[in-house]
Amino acid sequence: IGMDRWKETYCMVVALCAYVMIRANHKPPVSVLPRPEMAHMSNVGIGHILLEESVRVRQSYDHRENPTHYSVLTLWFYSGCYFVLARENTAWTYLRDATTQAQLLGMHDEETYKHDPLDISRKRVLYWLLFIAERYSYKPTCSLQRSLLTAYRTYALRKHRPISLHPTIHSPSLDEVPSDRPIAVGLELMINMFRIIDDTFINLWNRVHSTHASAAWITQVQTQLSGAVPAYFECTEVQEVQIRITQQWLRSQAWQLSACQGLVSSVSNDIPLTFKYPIEIARDLLTISHQFSQQAMEVHGVGLVSRFPFFAPSALILEIVFV
């Protein structure tokens, strides 16, 4: 193995360790820490040191000219680390680097996967996670598939930023590993929801063109979002809460888009185009809060309130969810 390839693998593993430490809720054994003084540091402090180490080593070799899936994964972990450290612009920059390198590798082209039979499903997972991240970015955990279980942050929608990846390849298949089945189902549902947030939606949201959305198109989007998640599916409780809250959040974003487009009216025959529609979404959120355990809901914490700013007062949502 070449020195650059060794460094690349090292950077990926250390970046993964950095993110696990930043997110961890328990102290690692002192015996595994690289320096004795780290035993007195916080998890975030240890993770920050590991992150800086990975970034430092990565700067010592040419990682741009010949990218690999390891380099894309490393950038993905960097993005997650810097977001947790409240450096969102740096996190976005690394996410952009990851999507660019993914395109250089042809991960957006279905033909690429026909010539590389090894670990295809995992590479597809990585592409689709990047696809979702641009639209509704989230913090990755040590397992790519399990990153669906964590708290989310928005980029293309909340930050009005452009997207570069599109739904141009088949969805991943993880059926060959029975333990991955619930995760695969959840990922498939997330992919299907974010397919609806297409170029037309993002361009209207970002006001790229002077064109306006039609009432029929908005109604179609709301119909697709409302039917995107079945009444029952196999997954963990926390994952199901995340998926169902994401669905309601996307419905709220579509309603805000229709309001900005001047399509909302108190006399509209289409319920998604009325002022009462946010109340319907709020009721669905209330139902979700009653269906699942407090522990599963608390995973989302204050982020749940920040995702639905037009449901006033915010204290009411906190009362609904946590009381």
Q: What is the role of each PLM region?
A:
Residues 45-67, 97-110, 173-177, 192-199, ...:
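Long, amphipathic alpha-helical regulatory blocks in the mid-to-C-terminal portion
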Residues 25, 103-230, 261:
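Fungal transcription factor middle regulatory core
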Residues 1-72, 77-87, 179-181, 232-241, ...:
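C-terminal transcriptional activation/regulatory domains of eukaryotic transcription factors
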Residues 8, 12, 70, 118-122, ...:
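Structural signature of alpha-solenoid helical repeat junctions
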Residues 12-13, 17, 70-71, 75, ...:
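TPR repeat positional signature
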Residues 85-101:
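Classical protein tyrosine phosphatase
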